[in-house]
A protein has these predicted regions:
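Conserved glycine-rich cofactor-binding loop
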Residues: 10-12
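A conserved structural motif in NAD(P)-dependent oxidoreductases
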Residues: 205-215
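Short, small/polar-rich loop/turn modules that mediate ligand/substrate recognition or access, typified
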Residues: 78, 170, 175, 230-232
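Substrate-binding pocket helix/loop in short-chain dehydrogenase/reductase
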Residues: 94-95, 99-107, 189, 200
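Residue(s) in the substrate-gating loop at a strand-loop-helix junction
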Residues: 138
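Active-site helix of classical SDR
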Residues: 118, 154, 162
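Alpha-helical segment proximal to the catalytic Tyr-Lys
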Residues: 123, 167-168, 228
Length: 243
């Protein structure tokens, strides 16, 4: 069984990805930062379905924490050869009044965090000459949105990281891809007004928000052997929003 580490796996898309990967045969390290209870729920869901996993505390912006989390995962489950960089942060606000410290936190969480986790994962992947990396970006990286300059910049950076790294490591049996979800009903989007939510849905040809398992299914494919020729892709899962 291959081993994957999913960041931000205590809830939302991360939990859906962790459970879906476990159901498809991966051992899963449930990466989390704040809530022991959330991580426990994810792990219990994995194990109750017959999967194998472990929970690892992980602050993705802290280099030592990242190194320790991968060490724990390697010792508990085996060499980590799959990584889903899912943990993220978003806070909306117009640029002119946007606090610099929140801008920096957005970039640190969404870009630095993915960089540190990817660098750590590559140490094992390069030795085994096999690996799968999926970065959770956003359709905002393609179309932008007023009030989300920081978030859009960070998610666009993830696409750039994905495409550049795919050229660095593709010949080593490692693929790197990005998934770009549209609007989801998660804690990160709970702040949206009904008017804003209705606007997004109206712009989406399918006419609804995405389901978590729909995004997780794309991640599962990109992590599989069947996706061995998919590399450097940025795949929207947005109901046609960016068509």
């Amino acid at each position: 069984m291959k081993v994957a580490l999913v960041t931000g796996a205590g809830r939302g898309i991360g939990r859906a990805c962790a459970e879906t990967l476990a159901a498809s045969g991966w051992k899963v390290a449930v990466g989390y930062r704040t809530s022991d209870a959330d991580a426990k729920e994810t792990l219990e869901a994995i194990e109750s379905a017959g999967g194998v996993g472990t929970a690892v505390h992980l602050d993705i912006v802290d280099e030592a924490s990242v190194s320790d989390a991968f060490k724990q995962a390697n010792e508990a489950l085996g060499p980590v050869t799959g990584l889903v960089n899912n943990a993220g942060f978003s806070r909306d606000g117009l640029l002119l009044k946007y606090p610099l410290e929140i801008y920096q936190r957005t970039l640190d969480t969404n870009v630095r965090g993915a960089f540190l986790c990817t660098r750590e994962a590559l140490r094992t992947m390069l030795r085994t000459r096999w690996g799968r990396i999926v970065n959770m970006s956003s359709v905002i990286s393609l179309r932008g949105n007023a009030g989300q300059t920081a978030y859009a910049a960070s998610k666009s950076a993830l696409v750039g990281l994905t495409k550049s790294l795919s050229r660095e490591v593709g010949a080593k049996g490692i693929t790197v891809n990005a998934v770009l979800p549209g609007l989801l009903d998660t804690e990160m989007t709970a702040h949206l007004t009904e008017q804003a939510r209705a606007f997004y849905i109206d712009q989406t040809p399918i006419g609804r928000t995405a389901h978590l398992d729909e995004v997780a299914a794309v991640v599962r494919f990109l992590m599989s052997d069947e996706a061995s020729y998919v590399n450097g892709a940025a795949i929207p899962v947005d109901g046609g929003l960016t068509a």
